[in-house]
C-alpha cells in the first residue's frame, strides 16, 4: 500500500491527511521531520586499517597575484605547461608535452616540497637547502572557502596502503583518459560501477607513452560524470616542473606525500601508463598536490 498524496488543512489547529493507493485516508495531528540515516559515503577510501578519507574535488592550485589557494574546478583539470611563462609548448617524445619557460605563471599547480622556508613550494629554486626542514602541510592554508586544516596531504604509508594493502586494491585503480586528459582513476572501498559504464582496472602492459592511456580505456565527459557520482577519483598526469621548465605532461603523474626522507628528498606517489608506485623525489621538483579529508 503506497502513499499517493498528503494534504494539510490550514487552520488554528493544523490537520494532516494521508491518502493511500487503496483508497483509504488517515488523519494525523502533527508531522515531525526525521533526518534519514546517512548513506554510505561513496567516496570513502581506506588509507590504513583504521582510517578512511575522502579526496578533495580537484588538484591544489595557487594564484600568486592574489595569494590564494583553490582547488581545480574539475578533477581532470590541470595547469600543465601553463605553470610557466615563456617558451613554446611542444611534444618531446619520451618527455611527453614540455615547455622550457622563463618564470612561474600566475596560476600554478606544480609545487616544490612544502616547508616553512619555501612558501609551500612556490619557488623556482634548484638549491636543495631552500626546501630543507620539516614539512608544512598545504592543508594548513585556507583553500577556497574552507578553513585552514580542513584538508591535509597523505603520508607515504597512507599512499602505499591505498595503492597496495586495502582490500581489493589492485581492482580499484586503473589508468584512463578522461575528457582528453590522461591520468589514474582510483575507486572507493565500496565500489559499484554504473550499469552503463565499463571500468577496467590495471595498467597498459606496453612501454610508457602518452597514447597508452587512451589505448587502455577512455571516458567521455558524460561517462566520467557517472563514475564520479559513484565516488571515483581522477588524478591527472600533470607532469613535473624543474624550476621554470615543465616536462612529462600527459605522460606521468607525481604527487607529494607529507613524508620526508632526507634534507634533499621526500616521498611521492607516482604513475605512468604501465605502473604506479611510491617513490622518492628531490624536494626542488615541482609536483602535483592532492589533498584529503579524514572521515
Predicted features by range, described:
Residues 28-36:
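Structured surface patches comprising rigid loops and adjacent beta-strands/short helices at the edges
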Amino acid at each position: 500500500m503506497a502513499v499517493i498524496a498528503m494534504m494539510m488543512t490550514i487552520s488554528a489547529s493544523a490537520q494532516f491527511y494521508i491518502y493511500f493507493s487503496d483508497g483509504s485516508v488517515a488523519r494525523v495531528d502533527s508531522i515531525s521531520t526525521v533526518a534519514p540515516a546517512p548513506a554510505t559515503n561513496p567516496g570513502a577510501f581506506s588509507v590504513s586499517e583504521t582510517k578512511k578519507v575522502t579526496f578533495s574535488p580537484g588538484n591544489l592550485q595557487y594564484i600568486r597575484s592574489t595569494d590564494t589557494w583553490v582547488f581545480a574546478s574539475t578533477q581532470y583539470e590541470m595547469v600543465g605547461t601553463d605553470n610557466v611563462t615563456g617558451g613554446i609548448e611542444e611534444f618531446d617524445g619520451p618527455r611527453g608535452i614540455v615547455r622550457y619557460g622563463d618564470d612561474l605563471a600566475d596560476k600554478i599547480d606544480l609545487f616544490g616540497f612544502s616547508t616553512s622556508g619555501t612558501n609551500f613550494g612556490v619557488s623556482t629554486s634548484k638549491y636543495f637547502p631552500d626546501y630543507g626542514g620539516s614539512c608544512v602541510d598545504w592543508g594548513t592554508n585556507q583553500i577556497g572557502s574552507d578553513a585552514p586544516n580542513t584538508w591535509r596531504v597523505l603520508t607515504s604509508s597512507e599512499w602505499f596502503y591505498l595503492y597496495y594493502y586495502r582490500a581489493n586494491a589492485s581492482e580499484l585503480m586503473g589508468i584512463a583518459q578522461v575528457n582528453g586528459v590522461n591520468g589514474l582513476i582510483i575507486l572507493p572501498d565500496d565500489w559499484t560501477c554504473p550499469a552503463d559504464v565499463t571500468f577496467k582496472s590495471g595498467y597498459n602492459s606496453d612501454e610508457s607513452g602518452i597514447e597508452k592511456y587512451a589505448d587502455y580505456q577512455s571516458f567521455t565527459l558524460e561517462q566520467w560524470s557517472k563514475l564520479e557520482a559513484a565516488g571515483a577519483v581522477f588524478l591527472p598526469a600533470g607532469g613535473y616542473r624543474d624550476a621554470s621548465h615543465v616536462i612529462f605532461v600527459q605522460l606521468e603523474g607525481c604527487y607529494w606525500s607529507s613524508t620526508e626522507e632526507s634534507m634533499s628528498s621526500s616521498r611521492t606517489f607516482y604513475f605512468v601508463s604501465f605502473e604506479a608506485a611510491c617513490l622518492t623525489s628531490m624536494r626542488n621538483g615541482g609536483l602535483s598536490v592532492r589533498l584529503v579529508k579524514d572521515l
